[in-house]
Amino acid sequence: MAHRKLESVGSGMLDHRVRPGPVPHSQEPESEDMELPLEGYVPEGLELAALRPESPAPEEQECHNHSPDGDSSSDYVNNTSEEEDYDEGLPEEEEGITYYIRYCPEDDSYLEGMDCNGEEYLAHSAHPVDTDECQEAVEEWTDSAGPHPHGHEAEGSQDYPDGQLPIPEDEPSVLEAHDQEEDGHYCASKEGYQDYYPEEANGNTGASPYRLRRGDGDLEDQEEDIDQIVAEIKMSLSMTSITSASEASPEHGPEPGPEDSVEACPPIKASCSPSRHEARPKSLNLLPEAKHPGDPQRGFKPKTRTPEERLKWPHEQVCNGLEQPRKQQRSDLNGPVDNNNIPETKKVASFPSFVAVPGPCEPEDLIDGIIFAANYLGSTQLLSERNPSKNIRMMQAQEAVSRVKRMQKAAKIKKKANSEGDAQTLTEVDLFISTQRIKVLNADTQETMMDHALRTISYIADIGNIVVLMARRRMPRSASQDCIETTPGAQEGKKQYKMICHVFESEDAQLIAQSIGQAFSVAYQEFLRANGINPEDLSQKEYSDIINTQEMYNDDLIHFSNSENCKELQLEKHKGEILGVVVVESGWGSILPTVILANMMNGGPAARSGKLSIGDQIMSINGTSLVGLPLATCQGIIKGLKNQTQVKLNIVSCPPVTTVLIKRPDLKYQLGFSVQNGIICSLMRGGIAERGGVRVGHRIIEINGQSVVATAHEKIVQALSNSVGEIHMKTMPAAMFRLLTGQETPLYI
């Protein structure tokens, strides 16, 4: 087996091949679906090369100060929005089964969201979220983190961030800000799994690359209003650097035409050891005449594209509607589809070239597409929670590799038993990466084996010379085979989802991960340009300066550090008697995440003592700390007190209503949290809202001295979006609010 050794940027290990444009959806083959067993799928005759040991993990880095040093074991995370739970059936092979992929953008490494019917992102401009249940969503942030590997940030001297970031897609999701953490996380938006092993579609069709395939069931979901996304971004221009916000929609991003040029990354040169791969064409999307035997494929050189033409693509794509069966998305796009001479086009063309996006490739080359040589080792499926931690993500990647390795060994033993010889040949593939999609093509035939829109990638990790690519299937509106609840009524976080995992071997595993992260950043820039937004306006420094001048957690630090508020109580109770309390979560974003006393049973031990009040936060019970524990665990500890006669509590006396103070100097600064029906659903880490004391799961009771308990949802959003200066709010846990207002019957423990 000939290993294809490619030159990297520094070491000459990267085979950098370019294609003029990704294969259009309309040219993708239709194939039947194939359900992969949970144990995994490995093509016969494959053998996994030994994994190289992992390099030491990089130190945790802040999102704006990243070292360029990478880690040989990095990972990329994308949790997409659970709000976007419309159906999108994706065909696979052989069994005629349709699977679905579901949105889930809030990763525990960045956002903590509660179960809401929908989200409302606070901004001065409304932004709809395509969901069946939520009301109009108003978004309040764009991101400061980009999808880049190995802990580097995409901003000037910064390299790839380890954060996660959803990207706008064919149904543009809310643009959410994501923080960076360790292990080189990077993130996309909507996850999906498309056309596993299409039988034809080698990418060499001459049809328009603007034609996109759509299922009939998606028509309603495609009718989003991009106008509102763009308006929101324009009003939040100071939030993030474009180089660190890698959100993009393959449908809204640039789609190079067949006549566009092929430009290779200058620092990357193709250098392969003699093998059959040297005979492969550099361009995957050849014109029809280039496919005839007599035509020289390598000599084909498309028309050179000027910078102005490059900048015009994304806007033309949005204006022309991409031949999709959706209505015109913006009021200024209702003219003829060939009329691109509108003010925004001129504005886009006036923008400078790409803002610096650190990575191994030139931005223009990622638009055209680049190719890495790799060996396809196999695929498997894993069950995963909605928002697993970073460590669990990496463990899942390692588990996928282990399963594929076991399957390869089994295939090898079976082949020997059948006296077929022990010659093992790995499937050599070309891994095509662009701002539109990631494709896996057979190295010899150039037939498409797998095709994923860039937005569908939920996670990617490189472990030594192994690359693991993951995508999670969307949930249908009704019960789905892809979601298995462990117990009836289980919380969302307890549900299990099927993750499809593809495993590849390549000496450029790290570069592959970096290139995918860079592709997200470039795609996001193209999305902004397409909608008349100058990426250079998204400055992070000014927002960071505002953050650094604000106190953390409002008055919480003072309150919790005051010894008069910290009490140690001794409660007497009868054996077999319950404590008689209801506890709720303090809410993500609180200085000490623990449980809050929400109600007490009349005549119960807690009420009889006269020492407890609603709103008190319980730090420990009988020496067992409750800080940071899940609500169910805390409830279990309290239930375990039933047979005891004395209970020792450590509490912090707190009022039931939390006071929030958000300092917003200007409307251009995002608030950094989302609400639905007055309930805070998610919170941006490190934003002015977190600094001010906003907590996930809290119900907003009052804004600037005015009660909003009976106020319509839209008016709450409007009040917050238009507020500037000091924004005073009062909130309390939503569960406590429902108990106090009689909307729920308390279940005492």
Swiss-Prot record:
This is Amyloid-beta A4 precursor protein-binding family A member 2. It comes from Homo sapiens. The gene is APBA2. SUPFAM superfamilies: PDZ domain-like (SSF50156), PH domain-like (SSF50729). The lineage of its organism: Eukaryota, Metazoa, Chordata, Craniata, Vertebrata. Residues 305-315 have a biased composition (Basic and acidic residues). Residues 70-80, 238-247 have a biased composition (Polar residues). Pfam families: PDZ, PID. Residues 185-270 are annotated as: STXBP1-binding. Brain. Residues 81-94, 131-142 have a biased composition (Acidic residues). Putative function in synaptic vesicle exocytosis by binding to STXBP1, an essential component of the synaptic vesicle exocytotic machinery. May modulate processing of the amyloid-beta precursor protein (APP) and hence formation of APP-beta. The modification Phosphoserine is found at residues 11, 208. GO terms for biological process: chemical synaptic transmission; in utero embryonic development; locomotory behavior; multicellular organism growth; nervous system development; presynaptic modulation of chemical synaptic transmission; protein transport; regulation of gene expression. InterPro entries: APP-Binding, PDZ, PDZ_sf, PH-like_dom_sf, PTB/PI_dom. It comes from the Eukaryota.
